[in-house]
């Protein structure tokens, strides 16, 4: 059961901080511009690794790369404009939930359920708590 799987993951992982800074792109492989993570990468990778086991195991189309997509499947001029406009973006937020979405028949992603991250906080690379 997917919900039981996600509940167990959320219980094993604590909240963490994500710091977003600057932009990047997956072009020419994929027409995507994203805001890059400067902090929280390891926490995202741990959640991804845990999630892609059991009922959600399966091959990836691309290697996992934590990011926030801000533009995709638009023309190159629009991608260039977004990448330049957000180049100096800098923001921080706390991740407190793992959320399950479904992709409906109309192609829209819709939230179904949130799972609170209630596990212990992981240590950062310098040995401190986030």
Feature map (PLM): residue ranges:
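Histidine-dependent nucleotide/RNA phosphoesterase domain, centered on the 2H-phosphoesterase fold
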Residues: 1-130
